[in-house]
């Protein structure tokens, strides 16, 4: 029986400094020695921040902002695949396991599957954190690793959500889906 790949969410904050080497280290490791064992879920980075700013300015709906944030994740994923050609952009959930079995490291682009889905709240209580857990449940992976650039205090997911370290919906979806969620600092060894 083939083991399900781990879902690794690379926070959008990893994309903020192209010279610090953290993003490069994680992507090269995931595309190299860990190839075939992980699916990457990209954060939305500056693209998602732009959606938040535009929503504040224009006051468009949470639903529209959610759909735009999904595309922000797609944009970051496409950028990762261009910067690190060993990574493989994939918008088809059903193909992720096949790509891993073939020894590739897919980067999941979520808008195709989640654009009109009602599986998750369609507002800012859901970010790429909860989306990574949703994907893990969907592909049968029992665990998710969230890679963050911020300080990671001790605490359960509810405490981390209260501190803004993870999104507010994460504790609920992780418990409901029975997914183990771990956090790693971007500077930590893989």
Name each model-derived stretch.
Residues 1-189:
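Nucleotide/pyrophosphate-binding catalytic subdomain
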